[in-house]
Amino acid sequence: MLMESYDNDRAWEAVSLAATLGGMVIGVAGVSAAHGLEHPASGLKNIVHGRGLAALTPIIVDRLAPALPQKFAEVSKILGGKDETDCADSIRKFLKAIDLDVKLGDLGIVQDDVQWMTDNCMKISAGNLNNAPKVFSKEEVAEIYSLAI
C-alpha cells in the first residue's frame, strides 16, 4: 500500500509500528551479519539502510542457511519457497516484488570500495558478525561485498 501512495496514513502507521517493534527486538537481541555488512556501505555512500540490506541479505542468507536449516526453511516457506536451500532465492523474489531488487553497484559501490568496507566491517561491526550462527572471515566478508556489487 505504501509503495503505491506515500500519502496513505494507514500504511505509514503500519510501517511505523513494524519499525518500532523491530527496534525493540534489536534492542534485546542485537542485529546480525546483514546489518554489520550494510553499515560500512551506507556510511561510505549515504545509502538508505533498507536498500543496502536488500542488496546484501540474499547473499548472506546463502551462507547462513546451512548453519540454521530449520529457521531458514521456515522463512523460505513463508515466502513461498520449499526449504532452507531456496531461502535466498525466495528472498530475492520477494525483494523484486516490492521493487527492492538492487545491487550495491546500483547504489554507488564499486570494487575499489570493497577493501575499505571489509576493514571497517571487521573493526566496527564485529559484534554484529559475532551475532551470526557462523563465523565470517575477513575474506568471506570481502567476497560477499564483491558478489553484491
Give, region by region, the residue ranges found by the protein language model.
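Active-site segments that bind and position negatively charged phosphate/pyrophosphate groups
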Residues: 1-93
